């Protein structure tokens, strides 16, 4: 396979993974029965506006509602209002949207239906601090968590316990109305309580756990946050809470389904796929080093399977940012992978975020090929220094190997494919 054909093949798998999670493909077939009363649509996340549009197209009856999505992710809707807000660090637009959404839950009855459209990114987008915590104090904690290297599960535990709307609080506010949540998962293991910090799902975590996470990562949290966590007042709704008895949650798209769609593309091309898992976590560079070892084992010893094959994985790695670069877990993974492969022939890879945004940059990810390191050094770039500086985006931008998709309007986490030809 030529270098260009290799890139086309890898990109076709990524496109299939994204396509399998598009709201137009998965919302209509999961709609609830119409209620006797009102239908209120609420939602948050990078895919939520596209989910709302798909819902409007399939719903035969009156509805109203409010969606909070990321800047650049809005799509036209006729009956559901779309509000854009900041991600990954919350802004005032998200706070105002969250307050309005919570207010919409007041006065609902058993005859009413709330359809909640939840996808990744909602943890930052739907930001309504608990009483006594300012928006800026919550932002400060969020920024520190993003740089700490904490996995998404731990970040969301803290976020829920600093929030007036997350961790099942939105659903509790809708009681006694029926709440049906349609969820596009972006979290390892499809923990529905973790997607968007679970505004409509019971929360098993506690204030004590949130406080321990702050201590574990040495987060210099503002005094208001420490006081709130130490007080532990008004715990999030737990499994068995009567206010959540009329809740139904449906997983309509997931990382695993997207990985399987990519694997089907490989089989069609006559290349054997192996899915390592949809919930791989850890430091992005360490995952890159490990993945390189697996690829080299295939190349040298045909283990765990012979070439041609493609190693596919998903999940959400982390980057502990120590340098001045922008981070980005997929580009950091690829730099580490390339360095460990050290130009090994017949191995190429793609890693990208299915939402089109890797870290804080409007770039989905990048490619590497056997000539990645020689080309970089020919441009005067020190790859090891780029990795140490967490500057994967700068590295691949100079090489012209970035993958730029614009917002995909869905989000099922990272996609990685290592092709041994």
Question: What residue spans do the PLM features occupy?
Answer:
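Glycine-rich, mobile lid/loop segments that gate access to catalytic sites or pores
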Residues: 106-194, 199-202, 380, 384, ...
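An N-terminal, well-structured beta->alpha segment
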Residues: 1-42, 50-51
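Internal helix-turn-beta structural module
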Residues: 334-421
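Active-site segments that bind and position negatively charged phosphate/pyrophosphate groups
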Residues: 270-351, 359
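Gly/Ser/Thr-rich active-site loops/lids in small-molecule metabolic enzymes
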Residues: 133-150, 203-218, 323-349
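Accessory alpha-helical/coil subdomains and C-terminal extensions
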Residues: 177-180, 202-290, 294
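Glycine-rich oxoanion-binding loops at beta->alpha junctions
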Residues: 68-110, 158-159
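A glycine- and small-aliphatic-rich helix-loop capping segment at beta-alpha/alpha-beta transitions
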Residues: 54-63, 79-81, 102, 106, ...
């Amino acid at each position: 396979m030529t270098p260009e054909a290799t890139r086309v093949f890898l990109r076709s798998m990524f496109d299939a993974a994204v396509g399998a999670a598009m709201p137009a493909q998965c919302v209509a077939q999961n709609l609830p029965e119409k209620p006797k009363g009102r239908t209120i649509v609420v939602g948050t996340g990078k895919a939520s506006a596209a989910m709302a549009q798909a819902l409007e197209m399939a719903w035969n009856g009156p509805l109203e509602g409010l969606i909070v999505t990321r800047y650049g992710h809005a799509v036209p809707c006729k009956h559901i209002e779309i509000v854009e807000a900041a991600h990954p660090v919350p802004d005032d637009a998200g706070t105002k949207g969250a307050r309005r959404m919570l207010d919409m839950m007041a006065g609902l009855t058993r005859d009413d239906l709330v359809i909640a459209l939840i996808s990744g990114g909602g943890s930052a987008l739907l930001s309504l601090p608990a009483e006594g915590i300012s928006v800026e104090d919550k932002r400060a904690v969020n920024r520190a968590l993003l740089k700490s290297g904490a996995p998404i599960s731990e970040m969301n535990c803290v976020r829920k316990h600093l929030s007036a709307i997350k961790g099942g609080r939105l659903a509790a506010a809708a009681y006694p109305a029926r709440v049906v949540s349609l969820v596009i998962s972006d979290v390892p293991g499809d923990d529905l309580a973790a997607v968007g910090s679970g505004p409509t799902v019971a929360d098993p975590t506690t204030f004590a756990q949130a406080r321990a996470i702050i201590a574990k990562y040495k987060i210099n949290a503002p005094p208001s946050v420490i006081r709130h966590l130490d007080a532990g007042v008004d715990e999030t709704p737990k499994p068995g809470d009567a206010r959540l008895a009329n809740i139904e949650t449906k997983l309509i798209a997931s990382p695993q389904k997207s990985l399987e769609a990519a694997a089907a593309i490989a089989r069609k091309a006559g290349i054997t796929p192996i899915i390592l898992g949809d919930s791989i976590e850890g430091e992005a560079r360490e995952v890159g080093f490990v993945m390189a070892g697996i690829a080299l084992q295939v190349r040298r010893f045909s283990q765990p399977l012979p070439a041609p094959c493609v190693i596919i994985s998903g999940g959400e790695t982390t980057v502990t940012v120590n340098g001045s670069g922008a981070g980005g877990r997929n580009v950091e993974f690829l730099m580490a992978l390339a360095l460990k492969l050290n130009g090994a022939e017949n191995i190429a890879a793609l890693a990208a975020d299915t939402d089109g945004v890797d870290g804080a940059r409007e770039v989905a990810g990048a490619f590497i090929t056997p000539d990645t390191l020689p080309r970089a050094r020919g441009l005067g770039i020190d790859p090891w220094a780029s990795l140490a500086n967490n500057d994967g985006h700068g590295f691949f931008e100079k090489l012209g190997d970035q993958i730029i998709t614009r917002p995909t309007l869905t989000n099922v986490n990272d996609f990685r494919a290592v092709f041994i030809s």
